[in-house]
Design a protein with these regions (language model features):
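Long amphipathic N-terminal alpha/beta scaffold segment
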Residues: 59-104
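Short, solvent-exposed loop/turn segments at secondary-structure junctions
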Residues: 171-173, 209-212
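Short, glycine-/small-residue-enriched flexible loop/hinge segments at domain edges that mediate gating
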Residues: 195-210
Length: 233
């Protein structure tokens, strides 16, 4: 199968799962097909898929991710010893772990083609990530609390792991408790990375998107907590 054939296969199988989409026509243009495939992956509820589907999906995503360009740690600007700064798509990073700013459901973003980090990570990791996260949450039996962290395989991403954390939601004036919870996110991520022998971790700026944490304060806390961790023996 070439990439076009894989994409059409995946779209067709996902459409067949949803009776309401049975009469939907697959568009002819490549970019429109990619948008449709991403949307179908985004809205799909957790659930098993055939081994054939997963093999074709994994081959498709491997080529897509390689085509988007993989970025190694050696290519990133080092600000100080063991502290690096990079601006770009976190799903391209070939590091030990990337951090996902998740929601309390922990199974990804279900809004079709939404440009949040949660959606991007699940899109390029593949459907296995949602299923894996769902298994964790089914065993847990309650929504993920703010300020904690969970680690999963990265599946089709170039990193080894994804660390998921739920940041505080700011509505109105920033409070000390919200700052404490954001600090807890970073500390929990660093702790679980260490427990799993992760040698490099890429943080997004947690809670600064739709969760409305002030950007500058969030960035200062991220750098401070990273430096504290680096300085510890």
């Amino acid at each position: 199968m070439n990439q076009s054939e894989r994409r059409n296969y995946l779209i067709q199988k996902l459409l067949e799962e949803q009776p309401q989409y049975a009469k939907m026509q697959i568009p002819g243009r490549c970019e429109e097909q990619k948008t449709l495939l991403r949307a179908l992956m985004n809205v799909r509820m957790p659930g098993e898929l055939s081994e054939e589907f997963l093999q074709i999906q994994d081959a498709y995503l491997a080529e897509e991710n390689a085509g988007r360009g993989i970025v190694t740690l050696a290519e990133i600007q080092e600000l100080s010893t063991d502290l690096y700064l990079w601006k770009g798509d976190i799903t391209r990073l070939q590091v030990g772990a990337i951090v996902n700013a998740a929601n309390s459901g922990m199974t990804g973003c279900y809004q079709p083609c939404h440009n949040c980090i949660d959606n991007c990570i699940h899109t390029y990791a593949g459907i296995e990530l949602r299923n894996y996260c769902n298994d964790i949450m089914q065993r847990q039996g309650y929504a993920e609390p703010t300020g904690q962290a969970k680690i999963t395989p990265a599946f089709n991403l170039p990193c080894d792991y994804v660390i998921h954390t739920v940041g505080p939601i700011v509505q109105g004036r920033l409070t000390e408790e919200q700052e404490r919870l954001l600090c807890s996110c970073y500390e929990a991520c660093l702790r679980i990375a260490e427990e799993n022998n992760v040698e490099s971790i890429a943080f997004c700026c947690i809670s600064t998107g739709v969760f409305m944490f002030p950007n500058e304060i969030a960035a200062e806390l991220a750098v401070l907590l990273s430096l504290i961790h680096i300085s510890e023996p």
